[in-house]
Amino acid sequence: MGDAKEAGAEGPPAGAAAREGLSLLSQAESEESSAQGSALFLGGNEVKSRAVVKYSSAPPRTAFARLEEKTDLKLPPANWLRESAKLGPAGTTILGNSKKSKPFSSFGMAYDFIDSVGNDVDVVSDSENIKKLLKIPYSKSHVSMAVHRIGRTLLLDELDIQELFMRSSQTGDWTWLKEFYQRLIDQKWQRKKKSKEHWYQKAILSKFLYYSINGDGAAQPVSSTTEQQESSSSDQTNDSEGASWPAPFEMPSSVSEDPSASSQGLKNDFVRNILWTFEDIHMLVGSNMPIFGGGRYPAVSLRLRDNNKPINVLTGIDYWLDNLICNVPELVMCFHVNGIVQKYEMIKTEEIPNLENSNFSTKVIKDIAQNILSFLKSNCTKEGHTYWLFKASGSDIVKLYDLTTLCEETEDKYQNPFTMPVAILLYKVACNMMMKKNQNKKHYGTIRTLLLNCLKLLDKSRHPQIIASANYMLSELFQLDEPKKEENSESPLNENSDESYSEEEEEMPDSDENGSYSTSSDPSDDSNAVAIIKSVGELSVPEKYKSIHQIRPSCAFPVCHDTEERCRLVLSYVLEGLKSVDSSIKKESDLPAADPSTPIPLKYEDESSRGGPEGLEKQMALFLDKMGSLQKGNYSSQSGMIPGSWQHKMKLQLILKSSKAYYVLSDAAMSLQKYGRALRYIKLALQSHDTYCCLCTNMLSEVLLFLSQYLTLCGDIQLMLAQNANNRAAHLEEFHYRTKEDQEILHSLHRESSCQGFAWATDLSTDLESQLSVSCKCYEATNEILQFSDLKSQNPEHYVQVLKRMGNIRNEIGVFYMNQAAALQSERVVSKSVSAAEQQLWKKSFSCFEKGIHNFESIEDATNAALLLCNTGRLMRICAQAHCGAGDEFKREFSPEEGLYYNKAIDYYLKALRSLGTRDIHPAVWDSVNWELSTTYFTMATLQQDYAPLSRKAQEQIEKEVSEAMMKSLKYCDVDSVSARQPLCQYRAATIHHRLASMYHSCLRNQLGDEHLRKQHRVLADLHYSKAAKLFQLLKDAPCELLRVQLERVAFAEFQMTSQNSNVGKLKTLSGALNIMVRTEHAFQLIQKELIEELGQPKSGDAAVAADASPSLNREEVMKLLSIFESRLSFLLLQSIKLLSSTKKKTSNNIEDDAVLKTNKHIYSQLLRATANKTATLLERINVIIHLLGQLAAGSAASSNAVQ
């Protein structure tokens, strides 16, 4: 590339005068403006032009030598056709003696300026082609150009029909186009040789330019013999232009990407590449025009004209456009007569359109440019297709053909020599867009279209590297980790525009060029043409072909409605890429043996100059490095891939992509609860990863992170399968299903590896313990990966999630072993000792809980740590239950082992509460732990009370321990908070109070001596009975418990009455006992209600009703309690009657006592009659009791009122 100084030197001096609507900016100014991003318009009202030299290989500009008058240009100068220091390496090119530009010149430029292709530039072409297009309305000569579309950029190249047909005669290629062309012009094709005059004019021009750079030593003629040789050499050079055409795709696949292909003309041969903006058209133009400078003329173009032939319009346009494209403000014209120099004339670029005999409108040229571009944009719609813009010599009709479509009808569609360069360019543009870090996702549709069109053009067997890479890039376009937000596609463009064009005609100036093609009738109704301009005159009409179309068809990214569809699309591209890689891998045994008689060609060509498919390896390597650099292994794979080869690198990336896609599919299946399918996909993901590991020894941290994610998901799936054992058959069926695509990808993986590295994690077991164990191993493996790499610190959130899962699975396994131990315990009936199997299960369960607690504590997850501590407490309670005496119930005592394990359980529950800190952190868990702690204290106290260890401890000590445990149980039993557990808490509290009251009642009965202690026990018993009754009164489903408490209270009153001596004290106690009896009415009402509901149920026993109904009463218990109640009520009433009667004899006129006595006698007589009726049903007996209690309550109330 030329440096900035060279590029800047191409511009004219600042402040160049503006005349007739055109002005030019210096190169420095235009570059500066471009950098600032502001639009600069050159010229006044007619046209705007701006040129920026992007590249220049020209040497520093030197002043031209003004030749003396009468200099004979027919004599060659001494330096003719020789290199010169003033010319630099491109000397002959600068001076116009090179061959004409190669057929692929636009591709060479496109490769060099890949950033501009597809978006920024409308046209890439040789300046000669641009000029030829803009002169169409003025010229009768033929036009034959190949047009290709890449994104919104059109590539224009000359399509030399003569050369093609010469090639066809020699090789048999392109016969289809030859036949088509002959049908088109309706006559045999004949090649016309260029005239002697043509070669004479070229030689004169060449000698003139050499004289102009040779300075004082210019006019040094050489011998006529030398001149003839040089001239002959020049003619031969010019006449052999055909060698620049590449061979079509006829080479065997083994050499299809050989470096020698770079000689096919894909290099950028131009001295200058210029970004030319003409009005609103942005063009990348290649130019070889010699530019002189220095002294008075900083930048001029030099032209030679025959003084006898005036400049015509075509020549004027030619000169004007050349100067405009190269930003040259002046033209120096040297006039000669028969090769003898006459004079020089300086012309400003702006003055050229107004020269005599060469008058043309710059505005019309602008209209022609805009119309031609619009015409091509509207009709060259298919990316990758080769279009042929053709105008026969002398014709006014311009036609556009789609050669790709015509070629596809032939036997070998790869006969089109443009196919490969177009495919490479499509690939390079896509690759360039992909490698841009900040590439907006909205361009993904464009990239995808470029790549798909590239793939359409390539033969799979001949270009596996590009095909594999393109497929990989297609797979990279789809974001697997998040749903793709689709953007609305733009309205699709009409690919084959059949607009009717205007048929107006106008006279055009005669051409001064002799056409080498025969004029044909050119019927305008050619069915093979994509589009037709019926008259070149239409091109001069402003906005005649104003494009209403977009440059490209809709490139919207495909809408994938769900994750599976997106992943399947990715996997289809991955599979195609893998197939390409696999097909290109040949083991040494398959390679042909070297023939000793055949020389091995040595290639000395510079690597950097490559332009064909062989030059893509460097670009692909860059792309792969961009996506994640690879560490090379030092071994060969099973398939024979060489580490570091393109196959090795590409297969690694494709395999990694497949593993990601399968992981996302597995995750999606997991969310749909399709666990069998999820396990199948994660198995494929891990098999892909295993193959990756086999190919790549040094693992990247990114890949290790993927593996940790795969194993985490695998652990999740195994856990869910363990928890959903009911659908095992369905899961199994889904797990074993395989699509054809999956099988083919797996086949490619098996070429490199056995894929068994993670088989332990992906087997679908029917054993619950095995599934839980595998899940745990997956999480443990993930934890190890994160621990022994930098990933733990780089991905703290992922690490926390893994530890949470480890804690959770260890809890699950702990619970599993704990439940197994409990099951064994329930089966153990005869044996008194704990079995070794039970103890082993306890150890396993405890170990899992302990590790899980450690996992949660390490990430400060207090809630889950508390839950696991709670489960450990439950395990301790199971251990305690296992140690209870299994012999005779009457001889059983609460054992020290039971006490030990219950106290351990209490310790774990208290740790859980400490872990939570306060209820605010997690109220539900806090309440649950409190309940379990209360239950443990209650169970331990109950067992100590029921099976008092009197052989080891004194009665008083046991009573004290029971009392303390019961009070602690009450402390952790929340009866006030409204929740689903509140009735249970109330029942528990009532039961505790009942048991404490019973215990103090029993102590009072059995205790002699210490009156203070007896009084304390009496008070405590009364207090707890009262609290128990109140709490049972709140419950709707505990009438029997309430009745029992009240009967015990009555018994307690009776016991107190035995120690009383005075009748008054006894009457008071009896009155209190009868009041307790009255308060049992609520319990009897509840029993009555349930009995009535039972009777109301249909005899057939509707299952649904039975299910919804509350648990039926224990009739046996109710009858037992009722009998006790009847006997105690009868006893109390009788005692009351006796005491009141004896009191009445001693004292008279006590109205209250009389009323009570009367009421009690009446109730007592009714009770005796009721109890005597042995045929009465339970409900009838209850009804009688409720009735009697009502009378008793009414009598008590009446007596109270009388007293008042």
Swiss-Prot record:
Q: Which UniProt keywords apply?
A: Activator, Nucleus, Repeat, TPR repeat, Transcription, Transcription regulation
List, alphabetically, the InterPro entries matched.
EDRF1_N (IPR056582), EDRF1_TPR (IPR056583)
Pfam families, alphabetically?
A: EDRF1_N, TPR_EDRF1
Query: Can you say where in the cell this protein is located?
Result: Nucleus
List, alphabetically, the GO terms of the cellular component aspect.
Answer: nucleus
Please list the residue ranges that the record marks as compositionally biased, kind Low complexity.
9-30, 223-241, 253-263
Where is this chain compositionally biased, Acidic residues type? 496-513
Main localisation: nucleus
Q: Where are the TPR repeats?
A: 693-726, 920-953
GO BP terms in the entry: positive regulation of DNA-templated transcription
Note down the stretches annotated as region Disordered. Answer: 1-30, 220-264, 483-527, 586-613
What does the UniProt function comment say about this protein? Transcription factor involved in erythroid differentiation. Involved in transcriptional activation of the globin gene.
Protein name in the entry: Erythroid differentiation-related factor 1
> Which species does this protein come from?
Pongo abelii (Sumatran orangutan)
